[in-house]
Curated annotation (Swiss-Prot):
EC numbers: 2.3.1.129
InterPro entries the record matches: Acetyltransf_C, Acetyltransf_C_sf, Hexapep_transf_CS, Lipid_A_LpxA, Trimer_LpxA-like_sf
Gene behind the chain: lpxA
Enzyme class (EC, first level): transferase
Recorded superkingdom: Bacteria
The protein's name: Acyl-[acyl-carrier-protein]--UDP-N-acetylglucosamine O-acyltransferase
Entry keyword set: Acyltransferase, Cytoplasm, Lipid A biosynthesis, Lipid biosynthesis, Lipid metabolism, Repeat, Transferase
Length: 261
């Protein structure tokens, strides 16, 4: 363990072996820092924050600060990160609220680039990339292996499906289905642009899965059918494709409605 002499570590904080704490960093009460995690200069780890192993918190980042919610009155709520995350300079993650999940959760191997923001009660999966200044409002869910371009802004309670990609500057007010690309494209809010084909191929999705998703996309968004009729048609025509089943289940579970082209 290496703690710079100018760092401030609260006596109740728990630091595992191999943790490095840089100059002027602050680690507040009840924080838990896992093995091999590094905290950069001037970074702040707020109280009730749990970091797993081998995370890299760069200088000036803030993880676990109080939520920007006027209803919050200092109740015990948590921020929890898994392993292998990279939080770049000036990125911010806020803890949960008692009116939400009482915790903000991030999984493993995510990258938050500079000035990106994860608000209270968000759930971020694994392998997510948030480019510079991408912003999640409160209660947002981002599933695994999503890519958010720079300056993306996502409304409260929106869900972004796994393997989706959002182009830079996209404004998102409705759920984005898994496997899709969406951009604002000069419009005020996001529009679907098709499947994230390059991303799916890079991730090793089979030709059969991609073919099934293409067919499902055309039926859902290009056949001018009611959503329930489109889903029924797809289920009768595409059997045994897990990716298509995942897509349909996501759409049926959506609470905010689905972004369309």
């Amino acid at each position: 363990m290496s703690i710079h002499a100018s760092a401030i570590v609260h006596p109740s904080a728990q630091l595992a072996e191999g943790v490095e704490v840089g100059p002027y960093a602050i680690i507040e009460e009840h924080a838990i820092i896992g093995k091999g995690t590094s905290i950069g200069a001037h970074a702040v780890i707020g109280k009730w924050t749990e970091l797993g192993e081998n995370n890299q918190i760069y200088h000036m980042a803030s993880v676990g600060a109080a939520p920007q919610d006027l209803k919050y009155k200092g109740e015990e709520c948590w921020t929890r990160l898994g392993n292998g995350n990279v939080i770049r300079e000036f990125a911010t993650i806020h803890r949960g609220t008692v009116t939400g999940h009482a915790e903000t959760v991030m999984g493993n191997n995510n990258l938050m680039m500079a000035y990106s923001h994860v608000a209270h009660d968000c759930t971020v999966g694994n392998g997510v990339v948030m480019a510079n200044a991408a912003t999640l409002a409160g209660h947002v869910t981002v599933q695994d292996n999503v890519i958010l371009g720079g300056l993306v802004a996502i409304h409260q309670f929106v869900t972004i499906g796994a393997y989706a990609m959002l182009g830079g500057g996209t404004l998102v007010g409705m759920d984005i289905p898994p496997y899709m690309i969406a951009t604002s494209g000069g419009k005020r809010e996001a529009q679907l642009r098709g499947l994230n084909l390059i991303g799916l191929k890079r991730r090793g999705f089979s030709d059969e899965a991609i073919s099934g998703l293409k067919k499902a996309y055309k039926t859902l968004f290009m056949a001018h059918l009611k959503q329930a009729d489109a889903i029924a048609k797809i289920r009768s025509e595409i059997v045994g494709c897990a990716e298509v089943d995942t897509l349909l289940a996501f759409i049926e579970a959506s609470q905010r409605g689905i972004c369309r082209g």
